[in-house]
């Protein structure tokens, strides 16, 4: 059955800030304590969404999470009304409070892993929210993510939703940032590539030394089971631990795939040549499979991480070609820009590039690919999706107006002591749930 891939981009939340919370994420650490501009951030993301819509692609919208997370502050011993809790937390532990204000749910590549219906034995699209338990501020996300997914994909005949994996390091799961699907077309059976950083139980597999491996082999295996994946639709590979120690905290910082193309760095995988051969042999399609391996001599790991070349989106266009959606940092890096120009002139489906200014997200370590969750859907499945989360010209205008009304243009450390930021944020999200027809998905709505 004909199908297409829909990118559901995360709307940046009203409390977007630079707290340097993500150890192993170089950009996040380097920009800690800088002033942020939430309004600019959300509008930059919306501009990218609108550009994809204008290209003829079906584009979805993924709502942000409610922040600050007062429930976790209550669990950690802070009491009183909302303003008192914020005041106490700000005075006792301002870093903790900033973590509870984090807008990291904007990076929906970490929201969940999605398996399309052609790959599953029951013919349904499967979703499992990521537990994200390697980082405290991200571990707060899975319950709300699951509620949002159920509000967006709310038809049991087509969609299966699973509880996130156990909240424990042995099953550390970072979602689609470590997952790519290869196929001849989105409506045909594909090969789902799961990339892990380490094994919790197998001590013989190497591990990074400096930075943590956030995705475990055991988590990836569990997702394959939960999603009822066909044996021929799954392959598990280990990321090169050496590049994790150089700031490649997810596979989507060192590789990106789409349909019958894998674009990866020469050092992306452990035992790379064998890994690439395994992918070629496991590919279930009939089309030529392209592996574009970027040599270190042309793009160093440092350049890959600073430019986020591999955190670009790779999307299929109606004429069968592919577009690389890259951050402007790639254009500013001469080595990376030269390689992109060489690549789009070579014999492969990628024949054009478009650069976007996503500086607000990039400074926290998230490029174009971080901001989107890919969901392949056939016509019946797309018709079953909540239509109000699909971007239209009208919806784009409504969302821009909503953001300009509700978002501040600067946030610094002292602003997190202001209870008005909470009320502004909650009011904005309450309005957004009506705009996207999500119902009650946030704790403050469910408890009110």
Curated annotation (Swiss-Prot):
Spell out the molecular function terms from Gene Ontology: N-succinylarginine dihydrolase activity
Subunit structure of this entry?
Homodimer.
Keywords in alphabetical order: Arginine metabolism, Hydrolase
Instruction: Please tell me the species this chain comes from.
Output: Pseudoalteromonas translucida (strain TAC 125)
Its biological purpose is as follows:
Catalyzes the hydrolysis of N(2)-succinylarginine into N(2)-succinylornithine, ammonia and CO(2).
Instruction: State the Gene Ontology BP annotations.
Output: arginine catabolic process to glutamate; arginine catabolic process to succinate
Enzyme Commission code: 3.5.3.23
Could you say which protein family the record assigns here? Belongs to the succinylarginine dihydrolase family.
Q: Which residues form the active site?
A: 174, 250, 370 (nucleophile)
- What's the protein called, per UniProt? N-succinylarginine dihydrolase
Gene name in the database record: astB
């Amino acid at each position: 059955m004909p199908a297409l891939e829909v990118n559901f981009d995360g709307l940046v939340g009203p409390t977007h800030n630079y707290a340097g919370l993500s150890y192993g994420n170089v950009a996040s650490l380097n920009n800690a304590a800088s002033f942020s501009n939430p309004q600019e951030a959300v509008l930059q993301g919306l501009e990218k969404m609108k550009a994809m819509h204008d290209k003829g692609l079906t584009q979805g919208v993924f709502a942000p999470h409610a922040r600050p997370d007062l429930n976790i502050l209550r669990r950690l011993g802070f009491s009183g009304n909302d303003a008192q809790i914020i005041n106490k937390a700000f005075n006792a532990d301002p870093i903790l409070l900033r973590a509870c204000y984090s807008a990291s749910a904007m990076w929906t590549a970490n929201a969940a892993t999605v398996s399309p219906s052609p790959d599953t034995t029951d013919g349904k699209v499967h979703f499992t929210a990521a537990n994200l338990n390697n980082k405290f501020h991200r571990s707060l996300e899975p319950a709300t993510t699951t509620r949002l997914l159920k509000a967006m994909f709310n038809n049991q005949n087509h969609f299966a939703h699973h509880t996130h994996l156990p909240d424990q390091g042995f099953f550390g799961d970072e979602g689609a940032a470590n997952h790519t699907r290869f196929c001849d077309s989105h409506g045909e059976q594909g090969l789902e590539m799961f990339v892990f950083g380490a094994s919790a139980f197998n001590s013989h597999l190497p591990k990074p030394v400096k930075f943590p491996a956030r995705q475990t082999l055991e988590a990836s295996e569990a997702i394959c089971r939960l999603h009822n994946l066909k044996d021929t639709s799954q392959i598990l590979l280990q990321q090169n631990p050496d590049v994790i120690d150089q700031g490649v905290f997810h596979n989507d910082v060192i590789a990106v795939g789409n349909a019958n193309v894998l674009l990866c760095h020469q050092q992306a995988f452990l035992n790379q040549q064998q890994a690439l051969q395994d992918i070629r042999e496991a590919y279930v399609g009939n089309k030529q499979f392209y592996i574009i391996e970027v040599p270190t001599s042309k793009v160093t790991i440092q350049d890959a991480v600073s430019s986020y070349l591999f955190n670009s989106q790779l999307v299929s266009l109606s004429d069968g070609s592919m577009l690389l959606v890259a951050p402007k940092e790639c254009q500013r890096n001469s080595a990376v820009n030269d390689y992109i120009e060489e690549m789009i002139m070579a014999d492969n489906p990628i024949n054009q590039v478009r650069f976007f200014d996503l500086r607000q997200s990039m400074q926290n370590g998230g490029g174009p690919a971080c901001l989107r969750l890919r969901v392949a859907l056939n016509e019946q499945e797309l018709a079953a999706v909540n239509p109000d989360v699909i971007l239209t010209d009208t919806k784009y205008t409504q969302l821009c107006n909503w953001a300009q009304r509700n978002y501040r243009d600067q946030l610094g450390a002292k602003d997190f002591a202001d209870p008005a930021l909470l009320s502004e944020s909650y009011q904005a999200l309450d309005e957004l749930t009506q705009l996207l027809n999500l119902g009650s998905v946030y704790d403050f709505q469910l408890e009110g």
